Swiss-Prot record:
Belongs to the DEFL family. The lineage of its organism: Eukaryota, Viridiplantae, Streptophyta, Embryophyta, Tracheophyta. Keywords: Antimicrobial, Disulfide bond, Fungicide, Plant defense, Secreted, Signal. Disulfide bonds join C37-C71, C41-C64, C50-C69, C54-C70. This is Putative defensin-like protein 57. It comes from Arabidopsis thaliana. GO terms for cellular component: extracellular region. GO terms for biological process: defense response to fungus; killing of cells of another organism. InterPro entries: Defensin-like_dom (IPR056373). Residues 1-25 form the signal peptide.
């Protein structure tokens, strides 16, 4: 029973990694000439945190776009 459970867990991990390879490969996304998107937005890292980090990095504005924090020059 434990062996079967372990195999099931490993198969789930393998399948999950196959579906997420595109997300991991693109760490920086440019939405326009003035936008730089890098950090993923989550429940704990939302629009306010993104905006704050963009201002700290000397961008004029920032917000979550398509699940990523995008900073505007």
């Amino acid at each position: 029973m434990r062996f079967t459970s372990m195999i099931f867990v490993l198969v789930v991990i393998l399948i999950n990694s196959l579906f997420n390879f595109n997300v991991l490969a693109s760490s920086v996304i440019e939405t326009t000439k003035n936008d730089v998107c890098s950090t993923p937005c989550t429940r704990r890292y939302g629009t306010y945190e993104c905006w704050h980090d963009c201002l700290h990095e000397r961008y004029n504005d920032g917000g979550c776009v398509d699940g990523r924090c995008c900073c505007k020059k």
